[in-house]
Curated annotation (Swiss-Prot):
InterPro entries: Ribosomal_uL3, Ribosomal_uL3_bac/org-type, Ribosomal_uL3_CS, Transl_B-barrel_sf
A Pfam family of this chain: Ribosomal_L3
Segments for region (Disordered): 127-153
Protein name: Large ribosomal subunit protein uL3
């Protein structure tokens, strides 16, 4: 059985439970994915299944990639590898749908966070900034001291400073599957998922599933 599937984040909404409670959910279009390659221990040193997801125009695909996808019989925009418990159960060209998950199951979602550009320490690291009065004029959102003087005579590594924020690989763990729509290839997940709308996400079984 495959450990995960590729998809895209559609957006967020809310649904009502039988008790009338509202639950914030993220709508993810998970699959359908096609198996584009099988990784074997003899050839690659490990076992995995390469999945393809998304549509793309043929003129935008290079000829080497077209040759790679010829056996799958379909051109795809994204390709990622996922773990599997039984490699022999899959063949190149097989279609993987969202039915590999069940309602109530815990999952992990990997996505790329929204890029925020160059950000200061208040926005990037949550610094409180300097005092608003008592002679302050241009240091309200400044970081303050970044180190000593002659000793050590340099700025330590990993010092929290201003810089580019976001556009990073982010993993959110132990999200609950609330609803599955097999016809629309849609899965509803409780809570938020990293990334912007239409962003690529990897949905996989929880690596550290917690039991209630």
């Amino acid at each position: 059985m495959l450990n995960g599937i590729l998809g895209r984040k559609i957006g967020m909404t809310q649904i009502f439970t039988e008790k009338g409670e509202t639950i914030p959910v993220t709508v993810i279009e998970a699959g359908p994915c096609v198996v584009t390659q099988l990784r074997t221990k003899d050839k690659d040193g490990y076992e995995a299944v390469q999945l393809g997801f998304g549509e793309i125009k043929p003129r935008k695909v290079t000829k080497p990639i077209q040759g790679h996808l010829k056996a799958a019989g379909r051109l795809v925009r994204f390709m990622r590898e996922v773990k599997t418990t039984d490699l022999n159960a899959h063949n190149v060209g097989d279609v993987v749908n969202v039915d590999i998950f069940q309602i109530g199951e815990k999952i992990d979602v990997v996505g790329t966070s929204k890029g925020r550009g160059f950000a200061g320490v208040v926005k990037r690291h949550g610094f409180r900034g300097g005092p608003a009065t008592h002679g302050q004029s241009d240091r309200h959102r400044a970081p303050g001291s970044i180190g000593s003087g002659t000793t050590p005579g340099r700025v330590w590594k990993n010092m929290r400073m201003a810089g580019r924020m976001g556009n990073d690989r982010v993993t959110v763990q132990n999200l609950e599957v609330v609803k599955i729509d097999l016809e629309r290839h849609v899965i509803l997940v409780k809570g938020s998922v990293p990334g912007a709308k239409n962003g690529l996400v990897m949905v996989s079984r929880a690596a550290k599933a917690t039991k209630k």
